[in-house]
């Protein structure tokens, strides 16, 4: 294995036929800026993607430790349920008590970091060759990233979260406050999750398609730890943590989906009281479906399913909007956005010491859980975003990833959460016994034609999970094969089975507290990866700072500054010469008059 510069330049320029200074070269480029684009486009033809040339051999040093952890979790959770559940609860308490502040702080740091990157000169850099066109159409690109990023979460929490905050209140606020309920929900589901995904996705996309490294999370750390470090034990540890976070994050989604589909079957009177075997059956069907989708390839399976998801989700949202309290939803939407913006920093600063020290338990169940869930999803969502974003500029990537899903989430929660709150205000509560997985179907069945829409909702839950798990298993296959862009289908399928095993373990070991068990284990599994995402920020900035476009931009700025100084000096000399000339003319004129 050959070593290379830990900060490789993404573009290699040919030697110049004659020696000229950077200032002279930039002067010529300023006179004809199209020369710069042509020069960089020619040079970028030399980019070689290591991931495309790497043999599809299995990386056992990454696979074995990850599988050992998965198998140990399954054996522990199924064979010793009480011990496993107690450990998960104790570990959660330790994380929230000692590292809750880190989740809260860096969750918001990630948002500001990615916004600054988009607004900076880095935003013009393309994720690939300078003339490379995007691989997917914009509509398909948006639908794929949204379905992979949080589709099933919107289905599960879209109704129950705003209603819960409205009924029970939020630390530091009274109950029955619509503005606080909606703004807190938006805080959890708009900018913060997608900022995390954008950081991971951008780091991988730049490293892979711009610089030409392997499509591995560890490869994005080359600017910090060097090529040897990325290929050594530290790089392997990063990839192992990425796989573990992905398995548990996806398993949490599988668990939520299975619980809610079971509730839908009960609400439709298909199965009166879903048993553990019903849940096993649901998980098995979903697992087979997403494995089939994954092995069909990203260009086919995920794209088709994602487009279908968007159609079904739009149909469901339009139904609730039209048949439900339309005017109330329209009134709620701008108010929710205003409350979110005005209370952003107050919500971002909420810690265990808030509300006279009573907010800790609430944060562990909501904000910290969400931040951990997004972080656990970030390896596979980030890598998936990278795979579908080749050819787009950094600014286009960030704006698309950050704003479009955030806007859709805002509309979704306003429709479903707003409708649930209006029902509550009118004395037609859908709260039931407080089971979160039942409330979406309670809302739908309270509307005319809701029985049919309930069936569509169950189908949508399944397809949303399939797209998410499809992305996750494909990405885990890539990480298991040295960054191979097209992972072996059987490796992909194996990780799908492992994810299903973890999901069933968390559901069955939790018993009546299955949802809490899912949340607890997700937070614990995601904690190590928080520090990986923090490190990615530094690696990304160092990588971007060595991009030739940015370096040319800095050189151009220096040239412009030197040129401006020279102009000032020249103008000053010119002023002095003119002043001296006027003095001589006045002196000569005075001498002529005396004669």
Curated annotation (Swiss-Prot):
Q: What is the effect of changing residue 351 to A?
A: Mainly trimeric, but shows reduced activity at high osmolalities. Mainly monomeric, shows a decrease in activity and cannot be activated in response to increased osmolality
Q: Result of mutating residue 384 to A?
A: Decreases betaine transport, but has no effect on affinity for glycine betaine
The residues that hold Na(+) 2 are 148, 150
Stretches assigned to the Cytoplasmic side: 1-59, 120-137, 207-236, 297-299, 387-396, 477-489, 542-595
Provide a GO CC annotation, any one.
Answer: plasma membrane
Description of pH dependence:
Optimum pH is 7.5-8.5.
Subcellular localization: Cell inner membrane
Q: What is the effect of changing residue 189 to C?
A: Mildly decreased betaine transport
Q: What residue spans carry the Basic residues bias annotation?
A: 581-595
Record keyword Thylakoid present: no
What GO MF annotations does this protein's record show? identical protein binding; metal ion binding; symporter activity
Consequence of gene loss (knockout): Mutant shows strongly decreased glycine betaine uptake.
The entry's glycine betaine-binding residues are: 152-153, 253, 373-377
Name the segments for region: Disordered: 570-595
Please list the residue ranges that the record places on the Periplasmic side of the membrane. 81-98, 159-185, 258-276, 324-365, 418-451, 511-520
Which chain regions cross the lipid bilayer? Answer: 60-80, 99-119, 138-158, 186-206, 237-257, 277-296, 300-323, 366-386, 397-417, 452-476, 490-510, 521-541
Task: Please state which protein family the record places this protein in.
Answer: Belongs to the BCCT transporter (TC 2.A.15) family.
Q: What is known of its domains?
A: Contains a negatively charged N-terminus and a positively charged C-terminus, which are both involved in sensing and/or transducing osmotic changes to the domain responsible for the translocation of the substrate glycine betaine. The C-terminal domain is directly involved in K(+) sensing or K(+)-dependent activation of BetP.
- Would you tell me the protein name for this molecule? Glycine betaine transporter BetP
What is the source species? Answer: Corynebacterium glutamicum (strain ATCC 13032 / DSM 20300 / JCM 1318 / BCRC 11384 / CCUG 27702 / LMG 3730 / NBRC 12168 / NCIMB 10025 / NRRL B-2784 / 534)
Lineage start? Bacteria, Bacillati, Actinomycetota, Actinomycetes, Mycobacteriales
* Name of the gene: betP
């Amino acid at each position: 294995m050959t070593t290379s510069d830990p900060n490789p330049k993404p573009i290699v320029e040919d030697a110049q036929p004659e020696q000229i200074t950077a200032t002279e070269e930039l002067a010529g480029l300023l006179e004809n800026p199209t020369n710069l684009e042509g020069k960089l486009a020619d040079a970028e033809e030399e980019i070689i993607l290591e991931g495309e040339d790497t043999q599809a051999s299995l990386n056992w040093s990454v696979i074995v430790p990850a599988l050992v952890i998965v198998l140990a979790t399954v054996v522990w959770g199924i064979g010793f349920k009480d011990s496993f559940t107690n450990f998960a609860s104790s570990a959660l308490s330790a994380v929230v008590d000692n590292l809750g502040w880190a989740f809260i702080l860096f969750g918001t740091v990630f948002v500001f970091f990615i916004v600054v990157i988009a607004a900076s000169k880095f935003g013009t850099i393309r994720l690939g060759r300078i003339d490379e066109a995007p691989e997917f159409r914009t509509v398909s690109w948006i639908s794929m990233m949204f379905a992979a990023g949080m589709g099933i979460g919107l289905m599960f929490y879209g109704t129950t979260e705003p209603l819960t905050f409205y009924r029970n209140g939020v630390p530091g606020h009274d109950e029955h406050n619509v503005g606080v309920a909606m703004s807190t929900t938006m805080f959890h589901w708009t900018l913060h999750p997608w900022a995390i995904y954008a950081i991971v996705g951008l780091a991988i996309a730049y490293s892979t398609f711009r610089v030409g490294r392997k499509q591995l999370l560890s490869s994005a750390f080359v600017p910090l730890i060097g090529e040897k470090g990325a290929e050594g034990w530290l790089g392997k540890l990063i990839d192992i943590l990425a796989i573990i976070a992905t398995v548990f994050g996806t398993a949490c989604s599988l668990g939520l989906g299975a619980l809610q589909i079971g509730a839908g079957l009960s609400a439709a009177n298909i199965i009166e009281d879903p048993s553990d075997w019903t849940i096993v059956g649901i998980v098995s069907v979903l697992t087979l479906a997403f494995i089939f989708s994954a092995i069909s390839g990203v260009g086919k399976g995920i794209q088709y399913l994602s487009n279908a998801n968007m159609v079904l989700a739009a149909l469901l949202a339009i139904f609730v909007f039209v048949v439900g309290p339309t005017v109330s939803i329209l009134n709620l939407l701008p108010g929710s956005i205003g409350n979110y913006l005005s209370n952003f920093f107050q919500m971002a600063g909420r810690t265990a010491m808030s509300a006279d020290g009573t907010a800790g338990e609430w944060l562990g169940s909501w904000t910290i859980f969400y931040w951990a869930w997004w972080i656990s999803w970030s390896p596979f969502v980030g890598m998936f975003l990278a795979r579908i974003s080749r050819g787009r500029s950094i600014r286009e990537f960030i704006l698309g990833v950050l704003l479009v899903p955030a806007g859709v989430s805002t509309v979704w929660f306003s429709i479903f959460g707003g409708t649930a709150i209006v029902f509550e205000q009118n004395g037609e509560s859908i709260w039931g016994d407080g089971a979160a997985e039942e409330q979406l179907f309670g809302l739908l069945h309270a509307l005319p034609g809701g029985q049919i829409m309930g069936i569509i909702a169950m189908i949508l839950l399944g397809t949303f999970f399939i797209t998410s798990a499809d992305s996750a298993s494909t990405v885990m296959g890539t990480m298991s094969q040295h960054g191979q862009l097209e992972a072996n289908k059987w490796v992909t399928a194996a990780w799908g089975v492992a994810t299903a095993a973890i999901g069933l373990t968390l559901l069955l070991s939790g018993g009546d507290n299955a949802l809490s068990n899912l949340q607890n284990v997700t937070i614990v599994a995601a904690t190590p990866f928080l520090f990986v995402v923090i490190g990615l920020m530094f690696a990304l900035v160092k990588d971007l700072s060595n991009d030739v476009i940015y370096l040319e931009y800095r050189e151009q700025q220096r040239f412009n500054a030197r040129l401006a100084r020279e102009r000032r000096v020249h103008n000053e000399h010119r002023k002095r010469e003119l002043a001296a000339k006027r003095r001589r003319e006045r002196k000569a004129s005075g001498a002529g008059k005396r004669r």
